[in-house]
Curated annotation (Swiss-Prot):
Keywords, in A-Z order: Cytoplasm, Elongation factor, Protein biosynthesis
Keyword Cytoplasm assigned: yes
Family (UniProt): Belongs to the elongation factor P family.
Protein species of origin: Staphylococcus carnosus (strain TM300)
Pfam family, one: Elong-fact-P_C
Known role: Involved in peptide bond synthesis. Stimulates efficient translation and peptide-bond synthesis on native or reconstituted 70S ribosomes in vitro. Probably functions indirectly by altering the affinity of the ribosome for aminoacyl-tRNA, thus increasing their reactivity as acceptors for peptidyl transferase.
Molecular functions (GO terms): translation elongation factor activity
Metabolic or biological pathway, per its Swiss-Prot or TrEMBL entry: Protein biosynthesis; polypeptide chain elongation
Protein name (record): Elongation factor P
GO biological process, one term: peptide biosynthetic process
One of the record's GO cellular component terms: cytoplasm
UniProt keyword annotation of Cytoplasm present: yes
InterPro entries per the UniProt record, alphabetical: Elong-fact-P_C, NA-bd_OB-fold, Rib_uL2_dom2, Transl_elong_fac_P/YeiP, Transl_elong_KOW-like, Transl_elong_P/YeiP_cen, Transl_elong_P/YeiP_CS, Transl_elongation_fac_P
Location(s), subcellular: Cytoplasm
Gene: efp
């Protein structure tokens, strides 16, 4: 059991028949009454975000999440196929399960598949990915203010803002957390 006083961002817990990841938390000590911990939790099965308040010192059950290193192979209609690098066992996940991750997934990419008691509950991408620009308008030279950007589409179909010097065929490093341009590879 873990005390709510020991909460950390990213901690996974089992509360109310659900698996939750702590997104944010705050220890509150009111002038009158006992202290409590206000937390924001994400349900790892549904993706729903919920705010929950715990009494200070309350105990919660930790959720033992197993991370398996897997390789993304291909999409088969609405199903996406991953292969375990050690056992060569293949796992299929539905497309709606990978809503945000699909923007950055390409064949042969290494990802972490998160499982809880044999059930797949999440896919963790690397912090950054390298994707090739397939479409962008040419940059216009002239007197532009610093930080001028244009729109570019990468090989997965994801569209983002990039600096004017980026051309079609360039390989970009993209942050998977917020989908922003980091640099050219």
């Amino acid at each position: 059991m873990i005390s709510v006083n020991d909460f950390k961002t990213g901690l996974t817990i089992s509360v109310d028949n659900g698996i939750w990841k702590v997104i944010d938390f705050q220890h509150v000590k009111p002038g009158k009454g006992s202290a409590f911990v206000r937390s924001k939790l994400r349900n790892l099965r549904t993706g729903a975000i919920q705010e929950k308040t715990f009494r200070a010192g309350e105990k919660v059950e930790p959720a033992m999440i197993e991370n398996r290193r897997m390789q993304y192979l291909y999409d088969d209609g609405d199903m996406h196929v991953f292969m375990d690098n050690q056992t060569f066992e293949q796992t299929e996940l539905p497309g709606d399960y990978l809503e945000n991750e699909l923007k950055f997934l390409k064949a042969n990419m290494e990802v972490q598949i998160q499982t809880y008691e044999g059930e797949t509950i999440g896919v963790e991408l690397p912090k950054t990915v390298e994707l090739t620009v397939t479409e962008t308008e040419p940059g216009i030279k002239g007197d532009t203010a610093t930080g001028a950007t244009k729109s570019a589409t990468v090989e997965t179909g994801y569209t983002l803002n990039v600096p004017l010097f980026v051309n079609e065929g360039d390989v970009l490093v993209i942050n998977t957390g917020d989908g922003s341009y980091v640099s050219r590879a």
